[in-house]
């Protein structure tokens, strides 16, 4: 391990854009399939990992939803969430904010209570055993109807105090944010923070819709905003966080090579950019691997890496007091490692 990799791995980082269903490592997926009497198309973890080659977002989603089928019982959700949080802790993550999309599971007959108990139980374990700050976000699917999303909003209300935000993901093209304007107003009216996947494959107009019509607190991805200079200025002025996922963008052909990733351009234009994993096993890395890939391909300085990490801590859905504690952890780490304010 190089000094830089050790430094980055040790930084107290965030992962603000990660899907529990997309965090199933290949061997665990096979184990869960066996536990639930299922037969996958792949017999070994190596063969399954070899299938993680995608042409676009939809080709990934096809495999993603197939993987969801191995999550059936409360223990399955607990094991997957526990495994991710353990890996995140080992990677130096101090604040993790996890999406889960219950619609994929409840439509197959999985009780929402089983899903929530499994996920929340693993989160409580991580707080107790690792001192990890962790929050849960409920994501609705944009390829479904707004009425479906409203039903899900009603169903999750018994867990309102344990949910930090409402989000939306899935195939962007043909599913603009405006389709869910009433749903997000209802979520805000019920006191939820909000965030939306926009500008990953969709245009800058989708990012603007998320910001102006849905009035979200954060944008997930957001890369396409660069096509609209006025939108960039508004995002920068309002300090709207963008939860960018570099390795995800590379694997899904959003960029042809990491050297062409817009992350550094976004930073240069004053956008509040954070680096996250999205679906780490599918895309080849946790937060450290994402930062290292950007460092190498985009020639990021240590100062720029620290700035990205600080942005994540500032963008987290936490209280002011919790944020101060997290930022103090970063400042203490930098002081111990004698990191200068310039590279």
From Swiss-Prot:
Residues where Zn(2+) binds: 17, 19, 197, 278
Gene Ontology terms, MF aspect: adenine deaminase activity; zinc ion binding
Catalytic center residues: 200 (proton donor)
Cofactor(s), names only, from the UniProt record: Zn(2+)
This protein's GO CC annotations: cytosol
Key word Zinc present: yes
Chemical reaction(s) catalysed: adenine + H2O + H(+) = hypoxanthine + NH4(+)
Pfam families on file: A_deaminase (PF00962)
InterPro entries: A_deaminase_dom, ADE, Ado/ade_deaminase, Metal_Hydrolase
GO BP annotations, alphabetical order: adenine catabolic process; hypoxanthine salvage; nucleotide metabolic process
Record note on cofactor: Binds 1 zinc ion per subunit.
Alphabetic keyword roster: Hydrolase, Metal-binding, Nucleotide metabolism, Zinc
EC assignment: 3.5.4.2
Residue numbers marked as site, Important for catalytic activity: 221
Residues reported in the UniProt entry to bind substrate: 279
Summary of the function given for this chain in its UniProt record: Catalyzes the hydrolytic deamination of adenine to hypoxanthine. Plays an important role in the purine salvage pathway and in nitrogen catabolism.
NCBIfam families listed in its UniProt record: aden_deam, PRK09358.1-6
HAMAP family named in the record: Adenine_deaminase
Protein family: Belongs to the metallo-dependent hydrolases superfamily. Adenosine and AMP deaminases family. Adenine deaminase type 2 subfamily.
Listed name of the protein: Adenine deaminase
The organism of origin for this protein: Rhodopseudomonas palustris (strain BisB18)
